[in-house]
Amino acid sequence: MEVKSERLFGIPFSICEIDPTLYNKNEIVDDIKSNYLKNPVRNVGNIGRSGDNVHHSYSDWDNLKYNKVKFNKLFQIYKDIIPQCINNFILNKPYNLFFCITNYCCMAEGGHISKHNHGSEDFVGIHYIQFDPKYHIQTEYVNEHPFINYQQELRPDTLSIVGDKNIYNSIYSNVWKFPIKEDEFHIAPGFLSHQVPIQPPCDKLRMTVVVNIKLKCQ
């Protein structure tokens, strides 16, 4: 007897690695670090949340106090890579793609970002341009299915049986963290809520570039 296993209402997710030699990575990292040192808690703009501990650039790009980060070469890399990632999602129609570098985030020990989503976008990309997997804690994707709040109380054995190590069973976990390497680029739907836990001590700053992505039918 043949038995098939599928996943219902699967959330698409794409991961690729961006070659750091193809763009001015060191210059970008240096500029972000310089901006961070001027103000480690640059938490302003429409997504400025008083409880967050992060240096970010959202809605503050024109602030003359900070270095203007030169993303031109990296933008061209994204222009090539993003369609390759999106096409893996098995789409139904030709589309036009629009994206923008909407933010960069930088944090040290104690840094964190509270739960949020990019609900007005089709997808969001997170590029880990500086990340130490030995110390930095990964982005957590939050399971917002309503049953998760009581599933583990009503059926406490389920999670231990299915396990919390296999992504195919992630529906039973409150949050999911992918293993992350520096230079990886992760794309997920904009509606998928995520958060950055409080970071431990590390000599290296945790840096990400955030890309908002929209698709429109041709």
PLM feature spans:
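Extracellular and organelle-lumenal recognition/adhesion modules and their flexible linkers in secreted
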Residues: 194, 199, 205-207
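Catalytic core of non-heme Fe(II) oxygenases with the double-stranded beta-helix
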Residues: 103-185, 197
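Non-heme Fe(II)/2-oxoglutarate
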Residues: 1-89, 112
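Non-catalytic surface loops within mature trypsin-like serine protease
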Residues: 20-22, 129-131, 143, 213-217
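Short, proline-centered helix/strand-breaking motifs
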Residues: 187-192
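Active-site region of the double-stranded beta-helix
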Residues: 69-98, 109-123, 129-133
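A short hydrophobic beta-strand segment most commonly corresponding to one strand
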Residues: 124-127, 203-218
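Residues at beta-strand starts and edge strands
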Residues: 10-12, 98, 121-123, 205-207
